[in-house]
């Protein structure tokens, strides 16, 4: 395909135009009085959202250079969303401010590499200052405040705080669509996975259609069980203890399944067989998790363990196991806490190394089941458009709250960046273009607070001057127009979100400023459709 090339100022200005179009669409959503953006969908109803990354993803520009500029800023929003889960609008605004001010200086003759170096040094100092400012999240109310600001709804914030309080730091909070109206919180006790009993004959509670086994032995097998002769020696050992048995394996079929069912119906021996969750390597990993949690071993020929020679000490234990048609819950497994901690650490390392969103999500679920718990927030609304918008907001708010627990909180409303810059720049000693680069950062850090003020109908410059002279942590409450102690009032942002937004914006700004040429695909001219021939003497 033929290419077109632009150089120097033309190249940079083309990229800037694309960036501005994307950033201008995103920044109207910032702050408590930010507006929504409507996204057209090819199929179904339009989406209404105020989520920066969702808006950015939808923007596709026609001009090839502008398209590349928009794609670069999209990357800022996506990266911030991946790392911190929120702060995408702030990151986009910071990127726009850094690039705009930087290009002005490049056009005036500044060295782009010197500017880039100055920007990097300044951002590093401001990030350090943000970390010093950050206060640990100590109360459920602080989590609720963080989530409420992100979602723009105190009821949602309170529900998220309750969910995180229940499942703990390592827990997973998922958001699902519901057919009912309003919000609902569902908590899972213990480890739950999405596989139920193989046969309904295992049910012990006919009303609830559940098999509930107290203090059972748990046999974990990474293969199918079909022959009863392989299972019989172990069944006899378990029967002598008068304890029930739970079998988690790839499958139980044939005479092995028939033997278990017949003994259950006769009341001779209580048991339940469950298919192992997942497939392939993921199944192997989940079975390993269950084994560690319950203090058992995975019976697999890979490690030299055969079913027919399995002893009781290789089986797991738990206080209770509840099995329904679709899922199994293990309550209070008897695993060694040190081994569980080791497994948790191993999964964390895998999460850090993984570059696949899907794998990370699955690893996070495994981590939650081992170390925390799982809470599901069910969302209902009057229309599908409202439902999707609400779900979006709640997902952002959950990420925000988790980020706050991770690295602490700072004053919200763009104030933390502005006040961190005041302290950071006192210690900076740069000269020439590097000093100019640092000054670009100082000016850009005013952009979020100015935009919040603008969206609230206030004059940004006046607000910035006022906030500069206030004590640390004090700033504008844009919802009321008053200047208050933001942390005490609950107007807070996670330090991780604020820091990630700044670092990702600076990274892309450096690339913009040091660009000397842009190579893009030449747009294809669509030929006019051929005019159909005349119909002649046709009768209709």
UniProtKB/Swiss-Prot annotation:
Class of this enzyme: isomerase
Residues involved in ATP binding: 29-32, 86-90, 413, 477-479, 493
Known catalytic reactions: ATP + H2O + a folded polypeptide = ADP + phosphate + an unfolded polypeptide
Location(s) in or outside the cell: Cytoplasm
Enzyme Commission code(s) on record: 5.6.1.7
CDD domains attached to this UniProt entry: GroEL (cd03344)
UniProt-listed GO biological process terms: protein refolding
Record keywords: ATP-binding, Chaperone, Cytoplasm, Isomerase, Nucleotide-binding
A cellular-component GO term for this protein: cytoplasm
Domain of life: Bacteria
GO molecular function: ATP binding; ATP-dependent protein folding chaperone; isomerase activity; unfolded protein binding
Pfam family for this entry, one: Cpn60_TCP1
Listed InterPro entries: Chaperonin_Cpn60_CS (IPR018370), Cpn60/GroEL (IPR001844), Cpn60/GroEL/TCP-1 (IPR002423), GroEL-like_apical_dom_sf (IPR027409), GROEL-like_equatorial_sf (IPR027413), TCP-1-like_intermed_sf (IPR027410)
Classification via Gene3D superfamilies: GroEL (3.50.7.10), GroEL-like equatorial domain (1.10.560.10), TCP-1-like chaperonin intermediate domain (3.30.260.10)
Record function comment: Together with its co-chaperonin GroES, plays an essential role in assisting protein folding. The GroEL-GroES system forms a nano-cage that allows encapsulation of the non-native substrate proteins and provides a physical environment optimized to promote and accelerate protein folding.
Family to which this protein belongs: Belongs to the chaperonin (HSP60) family.
Subunit (UniProt): Forms a cylinder of 14 subunits composed of two heptameric rings stacked back-to-back. Interacts with the co-chaperonin GroES.
Name of the featured protein: Chaperonin GroEL 4
Source species of the chain: Frankia alni (strain DSM 45986 / CECT 9034 / ACN14a)
Gene of this entry: groEL4
